[in-house]
Swiss-Prot record:
A Pfam family reported for this protein in Swiss-Prot or TrEMBL: URO-D
Lineage: Bacteria, Bacillati, Cyanobacteriota, Cyanophyceae, Synechococcales
UniProt subunit comment: Homodimer.
Keyword check for Cytoplasm: yes
Enzyme Commission (EC) number: 4.1.1.37
Site (Transition state stabilizer): residue numbering on this chain: 76
GO BP terms, alphabetized: protoporphyrinogen IX biosynthetic process
Keywords: Cytoplasm, Decarboxylase, Lyase, Porphyrin biosynthesis
Protein name, per record: Uroporphyrinogen decarboxylase
Family matches, as PANTHER family: METHYLTETRAHYDROFOLATE:HOMOCYSTEINE METHYLTRANSFERASE RELATED (PTHR21091), UROPORPHYRINOGEN DECARBOXYLASE (PTHR21091:SF169)
Main location: cytoplasm
Amino acid sequence: MGENLPLLLSAALGKKVNRPPVWMMRQAGRYMKIYRDLRERYPSFRERSENPELSYEISMQPFHAFKPDGVILFSDILTPLPGMGINFEIIESKGPIIEDPIRTLNQVENLKELSPSESLSFVGEVLTSLKKDVNNEATVLGFVGAPWTLAAYVVEGKSSKNYSLIKSMAFNKPDLLHKLLDHFAKSIGEYLKYQIKSGAQVVQIFDSWAGQLSPQDYDIFAGPYQKKVVEIVKAEYPETPIILYISGSAGVLERMAKTGVDIISLDWTVDIEEACKRIPRGIGIQGNVDPGILFGNKESIKERIDNTFNKIKDRKYILNLGHGILPGTPEENAQTFFEHGKKLTY
């Protein structure tokens, strides 16, 4: 990979660094006025995320504003679905709507194999431009949704509070669900490889809804498919660091560590000292800062960052929030998060 690597990539690879890198999940988005202004001109989320010029511009907005150590592709975890024959729309304030939810064997068997270079070439274009223009001043990140979370969306047909439809499938027709999960694992593995080939230097897997599973069901329906995605990627790109994020993961941290990922991204509901004891030392840790703290004053933000970092100084760590930054967060508080984060030293 050569030396003079950007800080986040160096840290993710386990190299000695002077300070923890800092970026934020959803750092490009609604809390930024420049994004809201662009959204007025381009109200369709799918257009913003699938038009390469717009996706590139939005991805770069926080880089120009705050100079984070990571620049993440502006996209969505559902973006690869149409390439498998599953159409969706994202409705403002309602979230994603799947036009034809997947609930039968016939539907699963008729899903297309994902060919990222054909159906997702716009993603490749954006990542290639980001890699060139960021020019190692920051690390370019790609991301995907994990099989369980994608399945939850396509079976439920929309966001859900209790996941009754996919859980009904899990406990009544487990073979059908496993077939769907396996299809997603292969496709998502290929999609991640395409992102890396196009310019992503670190990638993150979001299994946002795996925290809705009991630990024993995580071992059946989520963990094995996360592992399969990781194995597909590592077979071709063994050096590329992979981060795994699950919302509500306090009950499954040890299980996450067994998937083969390099870094575990924590939400804010687990004490970071406890997490350090439960996650093997060879695995890095990211996040854990409550995004709600960014509604506080500057001193409370700085204090929380210091408090978090002091508990994890002897571990590989990437400063981040425990969830995406929330809409309505004051931009100057995001600025404080980045500025103070960059003052930390090992």
